Structures are given as C-alpha cells and as structure tokens.
Amino acid sequence: MAAPGPGAGAASGGASGGGAGAGGGASAGSGSSGVGGRLPSRVLELVFSYLELSELRSCALVCKHWYRCLHGDENSEVWRSLCARSLAEEALRTDILCNLPSYKAKVRAFQHAFSTNDCSRNVYIKKNGFTLHRNPIAQSTDGARTKIGFSEGRHAWEVWWEGPLGTVAVIGIATKRAPMQCQGYVALLGSDDQSWGWNLVDNNLLHNGEVNGSFPQCNNAPKYQIGERIRVILDMEDKTLAFERGYEFLGVAFRGLPKACLYPAVSAVYGNTEVTLVYLGKPLDG
C-alpha cells in the first residue's frame, strides 16, 4: 500500500498509492440513497468542485452515484478546480506535467511529489512543487524522498536533471531509514542496505555500498543528457526496479527488493543544480 511520508498530510494516496483516487469503488455504498443520491450529476459536480481531496474521498464512499460523478471524467470541473487550487501556476503553465493526460493525474502527481520535510537541509523544493534545488554547499551530498512510498502495486515516475550532474547524480528508491545527507561527494543512494540507485554519471548500479554492475547492460551505453527524462518503474509485485529512456526500455536494474515501503528518491552533489520528479501512476504496459 502507499504510505505517506512527512508532508503528505491528509492528501496522501489510498492503498494503491493513487493519491487522487478519492477512495475505492468497492467501498462505495450499494446505491443512491437520500436527497444527495438523487441530485443530478451536474449539481453534484458543482458542489464537489469546492471540496478538498480528503473531502472528495469521503464523498466517493457515500454511494455509487457520487462515486461515478467523481470518477467518470478525470478532466471534470471537480478535478480542474482542485488542480487550480492545489498546484502552482508554474507547474500548470510549463511542460513539467506534459506527460500527464488529465487534471486528476496532475493532482495525484502533486500528492506524490518531493517532500519538503524529508530532504537534506541543503536542498529546497521550488514553488512549482516538483523541482528540487541543491544549494552550493561544499563537501556535501544531498537527497530527497517523495511524500508517499509504496509497499504494493506497480508505479512509474519520471525524473530529470535541469543542471550539471557533477561527479555523482543518482536516481532510485529508498526506505524511510536511508539518510538524505552525508559529508563528501558520494553516491548517497545505494550507500547502504536501505537504498538502491543508478548513478547517471558513470552508469553504475549501487546498493549496500557496492557497485552492482553497469547499466544499461550494453556496449557503449549513452551518457545521460541534461534535460532527458528517465522513467522509473517500481514493481512491488515482482520486487523489481527498472528504467526507461524515452520509449526505450533499458531493462531491470534491481531484483529481489524487500517487502518494505519504498520511496522514489534522488541524490545530488552539484551546487545550484535542479532535479524534477513527476509521478505518473501505473505503468502504461500494465
């Protein structure tokens, strides 16, 4: 299930890590009872458009009519209004969320973004809500986790650097116990048994303080280009972590992941570099 980290608050996801799912259909009431159940969908949609995500979750459990009204259209006025209230104008105006097809998906991505309370003291999350900025602090490696982690289901997110990589730039996953700051310039993700990472600088896979081989496993693997979006795929059913570049599946990087709550995470060393992470939901192939 999805487990909220610090900063997720009442807006964290449901059992599948969906975030903006507003409750599951199996839990919805069996019918449309009472005055609310008889209200036309357009009236309900108008009322729902003033509610916050936690309130929408409760509404989705009232009856099937309310559930269908909320989930029948992911671009409805309900989700458009919530998206406009929850997300920064910059996030909606730029191409940060260009791969998300609906307002509901954008709200969900925000609930799964970097946590402002679970990152190194040397980084901050920009006003757009999705981009990490590392301050120019010497001899420090700094990371961040997302607000919500996963212990079941299949999940995908994309991450990209918007500045120099430096000597180490790692993307991957971490438990809540993995440190998000250390002295020196090191591969923080993968430095212990609580995190798994791919160093985009030298293409090494890292876990438990050891190099687990190069990735992707091919001759003359291309180096990461600044601005290039890497898709990360976490499968908690098969206990694997895989990566994609563009439309190319690069392969499974890690197998045998533990049955624990795992969070999308990054670590960086270069001063004033920026890293953006956007949660996509369930992988398209699944």
From Swiss-Prot:
GO molecular function terms listed in the Swiss-Prot or TrEMBL record: ubiquitin-like ligase-substrate adaptor activity
Single GO biological process annotation from the record: synapse assembly involved in innervation
The keyword Nucleus is assigned to this record: yes
Major location category of this protein: secreted
Domain B30.2/SPRY stretches: 92-284
SMART domains given in the database record: FBOX (SM00256), SPRY (SM00449)
SUPFAM superfamilies: Concanavalin A-like lectins/glucanases, F-box domain
Tissue: Expressed speciffically in the central nervous system, including cerebellum, medulla oblongata, olfactory bulb, hippocampus, cortex and brain stem.
Cellular component GO terms held in the UniProt record: cell projection; extracellular region; glutamatergic synapse; nucleoplasm; postsynaptic cytosol; postsynaptic density; postsynaptic membrane; presynapse
Swiss-Prot/TrEMBL keywords: Acetylation, Cell membrane, Cell projection, Developmental protein, Membrane, Neurogenesis, Nucleus, Postsynaptic cell membrane, Secreted, Synapse, Ubl conjugation pathway
Family of this protein: Belongs to the FBXO45/Fsn family.
Protein name: F-box/SPRY domain-containing protein 1
Species in which this protein is naturally found: Mus musculus (Mouse)
Phylogenetic lineage: Eukaryota, Metazoa, Chordata, Craniata, Vertebrata
